[in-house]
Amino acid sequence: METIAKHRHARSSAQKVRLVADLIRGKKVSQALDILTYTNKKAAVQVKKVLESAIANAEHNDGADIDDLKVTKIFVDEGPSMKRIMPRAKGRADRILKRTSHITVVVSDR
């Protein structure tokens, strides 16, 4: 049974989160949690939280056994960008894009 968890509008760029997502794709859930625990990136904390949510959803909603679960799919899409202004010298200003992303984790016992 497939179970999904999502984190929308995560405050990291999709490019940075994809680096972490590629580490755990296809792994067993216990191994994926270990990898994320020792990965020294801000995105690893966000992905770990979504993975733990997917595990809890599978256990509570579908009655799945945690030992059998695998990360079957994980993908990161771009979310909306917040536009901000950075003041510069001589009265000028630059536009800054604060990028967000949507993290989706699918776990399955097959």
From Swiss-Prot:
It comes from the Bacteria. Keywords: Ribonucleoprotein, Ribosomal protein, RNA-binding, rRNA-binding. Gene3D superfamilies: Ribosomal protein L22/L17. InterPro entries: Ribosomal_uL22, Ribosomal_uL22_bac/chlpt-type, Ribosomal_uL22_bac/org-type, Ribosomal_uL22_CS, Ribosomal_uL22_sf. Pfam families: Ribosomal_L22. One of its GO terms (cellular component) is cytosolic large ribosomal subunit. GO terms for molecular function: rRNA binding; structural constituent of ribosome. GO terms for biological process: translation. Part of the 50S ribosomal subunit. HAMAP family: Ribosomal_uL22_B. Belongs to the universal ribosomal protein uL22 family. This is Large ribosomal subunit protein uL22. It comes from Shigella flexneri. The gene is rplV.
